Amino acid sequence: MYQVVASDLDGTLLSPDHTLSPYAKETLKLLTARGINFVFATGRHHVDVGQIRDNLEIKSYMITSNGARVHDLDGNLIFAHNLDRDIASDLFGVVNDNPDIITNVYRDDEWFMNRHRPEEMRFFKEAVFQYALYEPGLLEPEGVSKVFFTCDSHEQLLPLEQAINARWGDRVNVSFSTLTCLEVMAGGVSKGHALEAVAKKLGYSLKDCIAFGDGMNDAEMLSMAGKGCIMGSAHQRLKDLHPELEVIGTNADDAVPHYLRKLYLS
C-alpha cells in the first residue's frame, strides 16, 4: 500500500471549472483521517494552495511552483529553489513585445503579470489570489520560483520553449503544464525531486508514493513515484513519453477520488 499520495490540481484533482467537487473534498478528508499522507503537487503558487488546504481543514505537505517550493504540514517553507537572477531578469522581458503572450512571475509571496488578462482569474475558484502588473527592468529578480507564459496558441509557445532551452540548457527546467501554459523553473526543479524530499521527511521513499497528473510538468513525478497514473485527458506528449504508466479517467469524472476510494477505502 502506498503511504504517500501526491496529486496535481488543474486537469487532475480539480474539476474542469477549477473547483474541488464535494466528492473530492470528502475523499481527501477520509484519506487523511486514515493516516495516509496527501501531498498537493502543483504548478500553482503556495499562497493559493495554502488557502485550498486550509479550506479543506486537512494536514498536507504542499509542493508548489512545480517543485520550486515545499511547505510542511504547518505551512512552513522547508525548501526553495529559485531561478538564477540573470535568467529571471531576461525572462521578464523576453516576449514583452508580443501582444499574444502573457508573462507571469511567481516571486516569493507575490504574483506579477506584464499586462492584464482577466480570464486568468478563472483558476481561482477555491482561493483568493491577485496579481500585480510589472514593467520589465523594474522588477527585482530575487526570489523568483518560476516564470510562465500563457497564450491561446500552443504553436506560438513552441518556439519559445526551444529558444529558452537552447539559451540556458540545464540551468532551467522548461515544461508545458497545459498546451497554453509554458513554465520555466530552475534546472533540477521538478515535482518528482520535491516529492522525493517530502517522502524522505515522512520516513518513506519514492516507491511508497502514488502520483496523479496530466501535464508535462508532472512527468518526473509520475515516472519517479512507485506508481504514476496519467489522466485520460492528459497531453498526448505525456502519454507518449510514458506509455508504461496507467491511464485513468478524466477530472470531469472525478477519476482521482474514485481511484483513491477504490485503493484505500473500499
From Swiss-Prot:
Reaction catalysis annotation: pyridoxal 5'-phosphate + H2O = pyridoxal + phosphate; sugar phosphate + H2O = sugar + phosphate
pH dependence of this protein's activity: Optimum pH is between 6 and 7.5.
CDD domains (UniProt xref): HAD_Pase (cd07516)
Cofactor(s) the record lists: Mg(2+); Mn(2+); Co(2+); Zn(2+)
Any one Gene Ontology molecular-function term assigned to this protein's record: magnesium ion binding
Short name of any one Pfam family annotated for the protein: Hydrolase_3
List of residues binding Mg(2+): 8, 10, 214
Cofactor note: Magnesium. Can also use other divalent metal cations as manganese, cobalt or zinc.
SUPFAM superfamilies hit by this protein: HAD-like
Record: active site: 8 (nucleophile)
EC number: 3.1.3.74, 3.1.3.23
Listed GO CC annotations: cytosol
Keywords (A to Z) from UniProt: Hydrolase, Magnesium, Metal-binding
Binding sites annotated in the UniProt record for phosphate: 9, 42-43, 191, 217
Family from the record: Belongs to the HAD-like hydrolase superfamily. Cof family.
Record's function text: Catalyzes Strongly the dephosphorylation of pyridoxal-phosphate (PLP) and moderately the dephosphorylation of 2-deoxyglucose 6-phosphate (2bGLU6P) and beta-glucose 6-phosphate (bGlu6P). Also hydrolyzes both purines (GMP and IMP) and pyrimidines as secondary substrates.
Protein name (record): Pyridoxal phosphate phosphatase YigL
Organism encoding this protein: Escherichia coli (strain K12)
